Amino acid sequence: MHFVSDSDPWFVILPPGAGLEALLIRRGGTPEPISEKVVINYRVEPGFESPSRHSRFWDYAENYFDRRPDPDRGLLGNGTSGEFAYNDKTMSFAADGIPILPYTDVGTFNPYPLFTITAKDSASGKVLASTKTLIPVSTEMGCRNCHGGPWRWKNISGMADDTARDILRRHDRAHGTDLMARAEKGKPRLCQSCHADPAINAVGDGKRLPLSTSIHGLHANYIPVKGADACGLCHPSHKSGATRYARGVHASVGLSCVNCHGSMSDHAISLLRFEEGKRSATSLIKHLRPVAVQARADIKPRKPWINGPDCLACHVDFKKPSDNPSAFNKWTGEAADLYKNRTDDTGSLRCVACHGTVHAEYPARNPYNARRDNLQPLQYSKTPYAIGANRGCEICHREAKRDEVHHRNMLRMVRRTVRQ
């Protein structure tokens, strides 16, 4: 899910700018990914075409990023409709920086806007394939729970000015900065101008802790609740919130944030341990007590957005997990190993292409429409399960197969059934 801080006059954590990726596969005995002589376009559903009507980002974009995108265009030039470009590195078509927001032109909130994706022959214009998917996007960052203020947008979502101002005042008082004065003069700072953040390829100033480490490390010392409820104070994951972004099969069987990411204190310790030697890391970690292990030293250091929970920590050999699975402290070695980036054994198919995106693994259940996340498996296989599940190899291969080409144990039958 793409978060948008929605606090543009005061600071920006993340700007509008989500991405779509597409794989086009020629079906047959030996399916073949197509990378040339095609044009793939995307278009958002009606009501989401004018994000600049609902955000102050375009008034401040030049201040933060030295760019002045046109209204309803993102920092990379893409709009809410446009054309994909082929990415040789990921071997997929990509449209990055789409400035989508959860606010609609008719005054409703929906953090799951649908996009229609159409592939055409570049010479003849013939439609080769068409499908629908969504971009999960939310402005429901719960800073107000501690910093005060209402929700900015219709008491549903977004960061109010009162909330953002309190954050800056506290930052200035704790760290001797002048962020409030800068913002009041119309020159607010991008958080990543000081704090490194691999999420947007920001290197920071090299002196401060990375952004994710700073935020989790500080707040873990103050948040009074435990377990997944601690995550839901800030992230749009709480079951009573407007977003409820944990939609996948993991959530449906009762797993929570903690099963993969650890408790708030454990999560923070893992990030702070990567920064050992920095004075601020030492200060933040010294009062944190681990939950899942005996000592802080037992928690493996990790870099945000690079070392994440490894799917195979629970799905050993792609088999059924244990009754109480946990991927905490079993981190991926590099970004390429993260679920969102990982490929199958052939190296040509991404895991998410068949199994669904992060936090919405098939079969998913969307709070705004139960089928909304499952449109592609329903389109291609008439079930909400992973595309090709239950030995459905003929979806791409046009015939049954006996070889487990993509990963081990892929030919076993799905063990759960879900009504859609």
Question: What do the predicted segments below correspond to?
Answer:
Residues 184-193:
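Domain-length functional cores that host ligand/cofactor binding and catalytic or interaction surfaces
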Residues 1-19, 25:
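Beta-strand-rich domain onsets/edges
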Residues 57-101:
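Extended, solvent-exposed segments with strong compositional bias
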